[in-house]
Design a protein with these regions (language model features):
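Extended intrinsically disordered, low-complexity coil regions enriched in Ser, Thr, Gly, Ala
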Residues: 45-60, 118-132, 202-204, 208, ...
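Short, Lys/Arg-enriched N-terminal segments with co-localized hydrophobic residues
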Residues: 1-6
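Conserved small/polar residues in nucleotide/adenosyl-binding loops
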Residues: 323-328
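N-terminal beta-strand motif that seeds the catalytic metal site of vicinal oxygen chelate
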Residues: 8-45, 107-110, 169-207, 270-279
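A cross-kingdom feature marking solvent-exposed beta-strand/loop segments within repeated
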Residues: 62-73, 90-109, 118, 127, ...
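An N-terminus-focused feature that recognizes amino-terminal "leader" regions
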Residues: 8-153, 161
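Extended catalytic-interface subdomain
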Residues: 107-109, 132-226, 237
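Short, structured motif recognition centered on aromatic/hydrophobic residues
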Residues: 34-38, 57, 84-86, 107-110, ...
Length: 328
């Protein structure tokens, strides 16, 4: 089989504690982790079925006409620490329709788990964040959840979620979704990072926004000489909160022989937005094999020269561990 090399260091550890690992971060929120990611899609039920079937997510909760929600339907899935919500508008005048018309299916909400949603909202808005939703208390028989939201790049939203006084399956207004169809999980553990694509010369603006508004730190940067192909190039800076649980790389286009992949995204998506969600696994070989067997398609395998060049790219980094594994 071909040789695959892996890198492991303190930044890529599988489990983060709440202690601060990035000294430059202000950590005035602080953030406990990713609470959920909400996609606005044309057919939420179909999307949920796909993520269950192909990726091994489990049914958690539902809100829609049957629960008294008249304008949209939402299906909540979970695998280990990952929660995805798929939402479809049900009325012609829903503003969610505008999101679908402009962007197609895409991420609207990156929700962040916090100890105090009101404090998180106040700390970020006083530093310049644009308000999406004022702090709101939502209650049912299982307790209460406090949520508040701010805008980030494009039409993307960060929702602060405080659930320390709640014991329900997801949020008030949702009912437990019991399904007879429960494919086995595929080893997906948690959201490792989420990448935002922004326009030409906007990367540093949003890097500063995450530093000033969210208290993040830029701990890794790539220029167009490091991330480039024969035809396409990009620039990227990686932002993190203090404990390393939330990492947001910010990409912008760079000049190349052809249009940058980031510019292509901006053209097709209709502006800035979440480009991809990276998910951690303890065993990538087993997980990818399982996903392939369920019909998930991956990029073609890089040539051997890619793997041969890994040691030279890494150099003598003392925090890196290289080892070789055969993969069929």
């Amino acid at each position: 089989g071909y040789k695959t090399k892996y890198m492991a260091n303190e930044i890529k550890s599988v489990e983060y504690g709440l202690e601060k690992i990035f000294e430059g971060a202000q950590d005035f929120l602080p953030l406990l982790g990713t609470d959920y990611v909400e996609f606005i899609v044309g057919n939420a039920k179909q999307a949920a079925h796909y993520y269950k079937t192909a990726f091994g997510f489990q049914s958690v909760a539902y809100a829609g006409l049957e629960t008294g929600l008249r304008d949209r339907a939402s299906y909540v899935l979970k695998q280990d620490k990952i929660r995805f919500v798929f939402t479809t508008p049900l009325t012609a005048d829903s503003p969610l329709n505008d999101h679908i018309v402009k962007h197609g299916d895409g991420v609207k909400v990156v929700a962040l788990w916090v100890e105090d949603a009101r404090k998180s909202f106040e700390e970020t808005t006083k530093r310049g964040a644009k308000v999406y939703m004022e702090p709101t208390v939502e209650t049912d028989e299982f307790g209460e959840v406090v949520r508040a939201g701010i805008y980030t790049y494009g039409e993307t939203v960060h929702m602060f979620v405080e659930r320390k006084n709640y014991n329900g399956t997801f949020l008030p207004g949702y009912k437990e979704w019991k399904s007879d169809y429960n494919p086995a999980p595929t080893g997906l553990k948690y959201v490792d990072h989420m990448v935002g694509n922004v326009g030409w010369n906007e990367m540093n603006t949003w890097v500063k926004w995450y530093e000033d508004v969210m208290g993040f730190v830029n701990f890794l940067s790539f220029d167009d000489k490091q991330i480039t192909t024969e035809y396409s190039a990009l620039m990227s800076k990686v932002m993190s909160n203090g404990n390393g649980r939330i990492k947001f790389p910010i990409n912008e286009p760079a000049e190349g022989k052809k249009k940058s992949q980031i510019e292509e995204y901006l053209d097709f998506y209709g502006g800035a937005g979440v480009q991809h969600i990276a998910i951690a696994t303890d065993d990538i070989i087993t997980t990818v094999s399982d996903l392939k067997s369920r019909g998930v398609e991956f990029l073609s395998q890089p040539p051997q020269a890619y793997y041969d060049a890994v040691p030279a790219r890494l150099g003598a980094h003392k925090d890196c561990l290289l080892y070789t594994s055969d993969a069929a």
